[in-house]
């Protein structure tokens, strides 16, 4: 308990010292460059890293986060998660994107490359690029046996680069959110290979309100993070097909992935994946 409190105090003091330098959360503007942070092949970029939550946890107490993902302490996220500031989180459009990170300036750093997934947001003006990592991900950058010592550093310099996501053996999953009903449909999209993030989702009903085939894609709206919704003026006719577009413009269609007897708070695994 004392060690855990000590690590939190160190992290808080480190962040406060940075905020003093920058003035405050409303102080001097940070020079963001979204394109550099989200581009592949940009090489290693400098960033600062902090951590939050339990020392060996996934970050949020509920194992979720602003992106809407659930159980990020379990496979395939496996607690290797991070908040991103604006160039990384991108108002939710960066949810699910994958980054390699490493540190070598702190004596406890191993220099080994680790991969994290963006599942949450943190807009404190700590640096141009800021990763607020889970305790697990932060400690993973340490030399063997020095995980806690590195976490006690509170805030460290790291390097990062965007990389394609890879979920071996998994297809894209759609989780129908609690509260969905015949005229309101909300879905979480997860486990996308390559870009990992989604910038648009469209829904096609199996038939129109008048009984005929539609063949019409209706754009859904981003609720927050990786959750997309459709507010309808009529009872939606399932099964539904879903079309998703990734950050790089690739499109996939999951035909009839949401069955006629769908229910809220349920997972529906597709048979499609980006490649």
UniProtKB/Swiss-Prot annotation:
Encoding gene, per UniProt annotation: EXPB6
Domain of life, source organism: Eukaryota
Matching CDD domains: DPBB_EXPB_N (cd22275)
Domain named Expansin-like EG45: residues: 64-170
Name listed for the protein in its UniProt record: Expansin-B6
GO annotation terms (biological process): plant-type cell wall loosening; sexual reproduction
Record field: transmembrane: none
Upper taxonomic lineage: Eukaryota, Viridiplantae, Streptophyta, Embryophyta, Tracheophyta
Keyword Ligase included in the entry's annotation: no
GO cellular component, one term: extracellular region
Annotated source species: Oryza sativa subsp. japonica (Rice)
Disulphide bridges: 67-95, 98-165, 103-109
Signal peptide (residue range): 1-25
Lipid metabolism recorded as keyword: no
Induction: By gibberellin (GA3) and wounding.
Protein purpose: May cause loosening and extension of plant cell walls by disrupting non-covalent bonding between cellulose microfibrils and matrix glucans. No enzymatic activity has been found. May be required for rapid internodal elongation in deepwater rice during submergence.
Tissue specificity field: Expressed in internodes.
Location of the Expansin-like CBD domain: 183-270
Membrane topology value: Peripheral membrane protein
Sugar-bearing residue positions: 33
Family annotation (PROSITE patterns): EXPANSIN_CBD, EXPANSIN_EG45
Swiss-Prot/TrEMBL keywords: Cell wall, Cell wall biogenesis/degradation, Disulfide bond, Glycoprotein, Membrane, Secreted, Signal
Family to which the UniProt record says this protein belongs: Belongs to the expansin family. Expansin B subfamily.
Primary location: secreted
Pfam families per the UniProt record, alphabetical: DPBB_1, Expansin_C
Location within or outside the cell: Secreted, Cell wall; Membrane
């Amino acid at each position: 308990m004392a060690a855990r409190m000590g690590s939190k105090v160190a992290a808080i003091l480190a962040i406060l010292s940075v905020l003093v330098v920058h003035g405050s959360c409303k102080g001097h503007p940070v020079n963001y460059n979204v394109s550099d942070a989200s581009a592949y092949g940009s090489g290693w970029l400098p960033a600062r890293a902090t951590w939050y939550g339990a020392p060996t946890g996934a970050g949020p107490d509920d194992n979720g986060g602003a992106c809407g993902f659930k159980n990020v302490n379990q496979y395939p996220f496996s607690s290797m998660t991070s908040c991103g500031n604006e160039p990384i989180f991108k108002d939710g459009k960066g949810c699910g994107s994958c980054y390699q990170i490493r540190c070598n300036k702190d004596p406890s750093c191993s220099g080994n490359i680790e991969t994290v997934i963006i599942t949450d947001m943190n807009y404190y003006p700590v640096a141009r690029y800021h990763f607020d990592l889970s305790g697990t991900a932060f400690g993973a950058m340490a030399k063997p046996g020095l995980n806690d010592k590195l976490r006690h550093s509170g805030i460290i310099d790291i390097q990062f680069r965007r990389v394609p996501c890879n979920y071996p053996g998994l297809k894209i999953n759609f989780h129908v959110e609690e509260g969905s009903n015949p005229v309101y449909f909300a879905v979480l999209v997860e486990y996308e290979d390559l870009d990992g993030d989604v910038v648009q989702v469209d829904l096609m009903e199996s038939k129109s309100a008048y009984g005929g085939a539609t063949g019409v894609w209706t754009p859904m709206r981003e609720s927050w993070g990786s959750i997309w919704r459709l507010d309808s003026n009529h009872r939606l006719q399932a099964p539904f097909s879903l079309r998703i577009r990734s950050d790089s413009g690739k499109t996939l269609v999951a035909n009839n992935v949401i069955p006629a007897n769908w229910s809220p708070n349920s997972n529906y695994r597709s048979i499609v994946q980006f490649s």
